[in-house]
């Protein structure tokens, strides 16, 4: 990964958490007990059902423990994925395991969005707002229409753009003609993560806007299904059996490229190697990587620690 933000350097965990919130809150959290029995990493998709045969640009799940890796699992749509994730959480709770679940989409929008949309800086208020309005099924969803609805609540044009559907959506431009909407283009973490996409782009290769809009409602429902059992990093202290974390598999692009040279599907390699890297790290190193304060915008787990993660992924 090229480029780091000035607040993203490695620190001694004993000295307190890195404040990466853009100065919006002074309090800092020190993560303790950051040791997980099992790590599941999810490559999400906002598209329609991708069929029975494993393929790229679909939902994939990687699973690892300190002892070894499971074969990556192909999930053909979000309904299947949500059901499986619920089963895995139930299984971990029944077994008394600590489970880390990572998702490759942002858990929040740039500072100020939540307040403008919901009247609150609490990221979970946005999760609930989206979940109450998104219609989602294996072969269709209303993400583009919902983005247009959000845009109508803001001045000017935007902040969302790139209607990738066949039907024109009022207030969601197909091209970037945005102006006067008042939102920052990127989160602090995205200004540090060179090559990352913004949350506002709803369509196009590599765009994550649709993933956020279809993914956060699923996370909201899982939190509601398992009350008091799931902590969401970095918004909450990791003192519950299950942790949700935001990932960006491109942090491991080097080791993924090495694996892809031998064949296979890139998405499958990404979740397998990301899960392996986080499962193989020593507890104190994982605690250091989790030692972040970004209470409104969230953060990408492992940004600034790319070399360490790639070394762990190569352990096999």
Predicted regions and their residues:
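RNase H-like (RuvC/DEDD) metal-dependent nuclease/polynucleotide-processing core
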Residues: 32-38, 44-316
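Short, Lys/Arg-enriched N-terminal segments with co-localized hydrophobic residues
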Residues: 26-31
């Amino acid at each position: 990964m090229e480029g780091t933000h000035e607040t993203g350097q490695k620190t001694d965990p004993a000295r307190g958490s890195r404040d990466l919130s853009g100065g919006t809150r002074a309090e800092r959290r020190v993560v303790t007990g950051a040791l997980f029995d099992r790590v599941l990493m999810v490559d999400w998709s906002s598209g329609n059902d991708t069929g029975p045969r494993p393929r790229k640009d679909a939902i994939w799940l990687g699973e690892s423990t300190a002892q070894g890796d499971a074969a990556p699992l192909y999930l053909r749509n979000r309904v299947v994925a949500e059901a499986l994730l619920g089963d895995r959480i139930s299984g971990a709770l029944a077994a008394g395991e600590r489970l880390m679940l990572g998702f490759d989409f942002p858990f929040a929008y740039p500072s100020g969005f939540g307040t403008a949309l919901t009247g609150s800086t609490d990221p979970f208020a946005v999760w609930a707002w989206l979940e109450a309005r998104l219609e989602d099924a294996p072969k269709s969803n209303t993400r583009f229409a919902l983005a247009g609805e959000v845009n109508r609540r803001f001045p000017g044009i935007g902040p969302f753009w790139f209607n990738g559907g066949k039907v024109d959506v009022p207030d969601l431009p197909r091209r970037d003609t945005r102006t006067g909407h008042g939102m920052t283009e990127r989160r602090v973490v995205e200004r540090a993560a060179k090559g990352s996409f913004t949350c506002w782009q709803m369509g196009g290769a590599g765009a994550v806007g649709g993933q956020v809009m279809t993914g956060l409602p699923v996370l909201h429902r899982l939190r509601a299904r398992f009350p008091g059992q799931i902590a969401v990093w970095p918004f909450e202290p990791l003192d519950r059996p299950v942790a949700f974390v935001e990932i960006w598999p491109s942090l491991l692009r080097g080791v993924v490229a090495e694996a892809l040279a031998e064949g296979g599907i890139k998405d499958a390699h990404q979740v397998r190697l990301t899960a392996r890297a986080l499962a193989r790290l020593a507890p104190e190193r994982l605690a250091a990587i989790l030692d972040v304060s970004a209470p409104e915008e969230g953060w990408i787990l492992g940004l600034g620690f790319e070399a360490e993660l790639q070394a762990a992924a190569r352990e096999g």
